[in-house]
Amino acid sequence: MALSVETESHIYRALRTASGAAAHLVALGFTIFVAVLARPGSSLFSWHPVLMSLAFSFLMTEALLMFSPESSLLRSLSRKVRARCHWVLQLLALLCALLGLGLVILHKEQLGKAHLTTRHGQAGLLAVLWAGLQCSGGMGLLYPKLLPRWPLAKLKLYHATSGLVGYLLGSASLLLGMFSLWFTATVTGGAWYLAVLCPILTSLVIMNQVSNAYLYRKRIQP
């Protein structure tokens, strides 16, 4: 027996609500896991994985879920308020990422090691730079008068697309970091595979949210 359109809609909405809730928990859980693993304060390097996971796993995920109609923690507030909260979270994520990047550069300088010799380091640098550009571009949406010649609809489309790319870059950086000697020396077996699934899961949830709630809608408009 075929399901009605209304039933399918309810099922799909329930699945998106469940996946959004899972993304909240996974983003927080992964960040806590890395913090426990790194023991921040035990060394200069120990702050790097903590700050980067805080930036790209927790803060950035929460910033994007802010616009989810099913799983936003502030969905009862107006879109304008949520947009400002989104920008604040993104700015905090950028600050954490910059600090994490600066500390690992200082750590390598102290050890006399070369910089950006791994895919993880290269992806991380690109993700931080992209996050900086994304935060700057967000100013145009917070204050549209700064870009009077650009249609607001196009700005939103570009920002959503660019934001998704930036989020995926950050997730890729986290994923590549789990192949590092520091991580694999401590986390092995099933725990390693579970950790790898964390940025993959949150990326899938964010991709679904952005593409279905915004990008797909833009494509089908005449």
Swiss-Prot record:
Lumenal side: 39-46, 107-122, 184-186
Binding site for heme b 1: H48, H120
Xref: SMART domains: B561 (SM00665)
Cofactor note: Binds 2 heme b groups non-covalently.
Membrane topology type: Multi-pass membrane protein
One GO term describing the cellular component: vesicle
Span of domain Cytochrome b561: 14-217
Cited PROSITE patterns: CYTOCHROME_B561
Cytoplasmic face of the membrane: 2-17, 68-85, 144-162, 208-222
Tissue: Highly expressed in the brain, lung, liver, and kidney. Moderately expressed in the heart, placenta, skeletal muscle, and pancreas.
Residues binding heme b 2: H86, H159
Cofactors named for this entry: heme b
TM region positions: 18-38, 47-67, 86-106, 123-143, 163-183, 187-207
Catalysed conversion reaction: monodehydro-L-ascorbate radical(out) + L-ascorbate(in) = monodehydro-L-ascorbate radical(in) + L-ascorbate(out); Fe(3+)(out) + L-ascorbate(in) = monodehydro-L-ascorbate radical(in) + Fe(2+)(out) + H(+)
Any GO MF annotation of the entry: transmembrane ascorbate ferrireductase activity
EC nos: 7.2.1.3
This protein's UniProt keywords: Cytoplasmic vesicle, Electron transport, Endoplasmic reticulum, Heme, Iron, Membrane, Metal-binding, Translocase, Transmembrane, Transmembrane helix, Transport
Protein's cellular compartments: Endoplasmic reticulum membrane; Cytoplasmic vesicle membrane
UniProt function note: Transmembrane reductase that may use ascorbate as an electron donor in the cytoplasm and transfer electrons across endoplasmic reticulum membranes to reduce monodehydro-L-ascorbate radical and iron cations Fe(3+) in the lumen of that compartment.
Protein name: Transmembrane reductase CYB561D2
